[in-house]
């Protein structure tokens, strides 16, 4: 096994992010790769995981791609591109039609994959993870002015051509128009190079809208009627067919049908409910000059969430709908009264009152969150 200096021209051509002169990288220059010492095997593949994180200020058009695109990419890579644009702008990503990574295992991209994440100050949303050769990933529009692209390859199989992602700046910062739900061919130009990509609806946005719609239904029958008014009964019967297509992993040898309506009702009924909660008595009563035994007691307090019980669940919180005070007998001790002239420390069994929540309600804001 030899330890060689990793030649600049090899990686500079392979680990690529190309942009026009207005898109400026903020990370260290790629020339720093001249001094990277990496082990190689006899097949000229990297044997140590190579990591690189690059930040790109998006002011125009450009692209990032897997090393050696459109040829086979190296093994053991973990490459990250963080794309930033000005406030009140968004970033659009379009995959080149030449796309191919190592195939998925059981429909899960475990080994080699490219992943896109939406980044905001409060959350990170995975827009998708792709591998294999079956289809080109859809066009993606960031929800904020930041988006992250990650490419990972393991130390086994590789594939070609890899991937190439064109990025561009969107200054409209408006919700996607209804016309963008149509399938059409979009041709753009970057530095004189044209590319074609299908214009498809962002699957994340479709799923969000569908999830909000599903929250309106309480039974499987109502849900299927909404999707297929003419054939919902047939769909309902087919759902429980004893075939691998309809049999879930939790089926095993169960003879009865799963009661989806009951599961849905349980989630709504018991997500926001009173439950055991341990409270510190001194903190609960706001008493600093006494101590108690036991120090803590169990009370019933509202807990859980309203995620599956309401339509606009992000604006809802689980709060007490009915609160009662209950007595508890505890041992109270006043540490300031120490033993003096035969007088014992002050200790006594006392009754204290603690709040218990008997009913919990989901309180929702009149305005859904942005």
UniProtKB/Swiss-Prot annotation:
One of its GO terms (cellular component) is extracellular region. The record marks 247-250 as: Cleavage. Activated by proteolytic cleavage. Proteolytic removal of the N-terminal CUB domain releasing the core domain is necessary for unmasking the receptor-binding epitopes of the core domain. Cleavage after Arg-247 or Arg-249 by urokinase plasminogen activator gives rise to the active form. This is Platelet-derived growth factor D. GO terms for biological process: cellular response to amino acid stimulus; cellular response to hydrogen peroxide; cellular response to platelet-derived growth factor stimulus; cellular response to transforming growth factor beta stimulus; platelet-derived growth factor receptor signaling pathway; positive regulation of cell division; positive regulation of cell migration; positive regulation of cell population proliferation. Expressed at high levels in the heart, pancreas, adrenal gland and ovary and at low levels in placenta, liver, kidney, prostate, testis, small intestine, spleen and colon. In the kidney, expressed by the visceral epithelial cells of the glomeruli. A widespread expression is also seen in the medial smooth muscle cells of arteries and arterioles, as well as in smooth muscle cells of vasa rectae in the medullary area. Expressed in the adventitial connective tissue surrounding the suprarenal artery. CDD domains: CUB, PDGF. Homodimer; disulfide-linked. Interacts with PDGFRB homodimers, and with heterodimers formed by PDGFRA and PDGFRB. It comes from Homo sapiens. The keyword Secreted applies. Changing residue 249 to A: Abolishes cleavage into active form. Disulfide bonds join 109-131, 302-360, 306-362. Growth factor that plays an essential role in the regulation of embryonic development, cell proliferation, cell migration, survival and chemotaxis. Potent mitogen for cells of mesenchymal origin. Plays an important role in wound healing. Induces macrophage recruitment, increased interstitial pressure, and blood vessel maturation during angiogenesis. Can initiate events that lead to a mesangial proliferative glomerulonephritis, including influx of monocytes and macrophages and production of extracellular matrix. Residues 1-18 form the signal peptide. Pfam families: CUB (PF00431), PDGF (PF00341). Glycans are attached at residue 276. SUPFAM superfamilies: Cystine-knot cytokines, Spermadhesin, CUB domain. Residues 52-170 form the CUB domain. Keywords: Cleavage on pair of basic residues, Developmental protein, Disulfide bond, Glycoprotein, Growth factor, Mitogen, Proto-oncogene, Secreted, Signal. SMART domains: CUB (SM00042). Its main location: secreted. Belongs to the PDGF/VEGF growth factor family. One of its GO terms (molecular function) is growth factor activity. The lineage of its organism: Eukaryota, Metazoa, Chordata, Craniata, Vertebrata. It is found in: Secreted.
């Amino acid at each position: 096994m030899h330890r060689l200096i990793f030649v600049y021209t090899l990686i500079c051509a392979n680990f690529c992010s190309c942009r026009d002169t207005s898109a400026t990288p903020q990370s260290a220059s790629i020339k720093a790769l001249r001094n990277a010492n990496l082990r190689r095997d006899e097949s000229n593949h990297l044997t140590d995981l190579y990591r690189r994180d690059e930040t790109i200020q998006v002011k125009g058009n450009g692209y990032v791609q897997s090393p050696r695109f459109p040829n086979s990419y190296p093994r053991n890579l973990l490459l990250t591109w963080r794309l930033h644009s000005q406030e009140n702008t968004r970033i659009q990503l379009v995959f080149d039609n030449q796309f191919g990574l190592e195939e998925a295992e059981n429909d899960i991209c475990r080994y080699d994959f490219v992943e896109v994440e939406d980044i905001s100050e409060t959350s990170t949303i995975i827009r998708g993870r792709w591998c294999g050769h079956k289809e080109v990933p859809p066009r993606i529009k960031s929800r904020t002015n930041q988006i992250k692209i990650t490419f990972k390859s393991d130390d086994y199989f590789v594939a070609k051509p890899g991937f190439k992602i064109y990025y561009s700046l969107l200054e409209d910062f408006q919700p996607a128009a209804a016309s963008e739900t149509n399938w059409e061919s979009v041709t753009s130009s970057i530095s004189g190079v044209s590319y074609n990509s299908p214009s498809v609806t962002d699957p994340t946005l479709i799923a969000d809208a569908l999830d909000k719609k599903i929250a309106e239904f309480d039974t499987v029958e109502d849900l299927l009627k909404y999707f297929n008014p003419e054939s919902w009964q047939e769909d309902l019967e087919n759902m429980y067919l004893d075939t691998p297509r309809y049999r879930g992993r939790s089926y095993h040898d169960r003879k009865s049908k799963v009661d989806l309506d009951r599961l849905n009702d349980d989630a709504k009924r018991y997500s926001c409910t009173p439950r055991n909660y341990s409270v510190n008595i001194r903190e609960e009563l706001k008493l600093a000059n006494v101590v108690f035994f036991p120090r803590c007691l169990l009370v019933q307090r509202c807990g859980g969430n309203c995620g599956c019980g309401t339509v606009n669940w992000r604006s809802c919180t689980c709060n007490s709908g009915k609160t009662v005070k209950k007595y508890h007998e505890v041992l109270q001790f006043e540490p300031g009264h120490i033993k003096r002239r035969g007088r014992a420390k002050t200790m006594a069994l006392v009754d204290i009152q603690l709040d218990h929540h008997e009913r919990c309600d989901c309180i929702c804001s009149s305005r859904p969150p942005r």
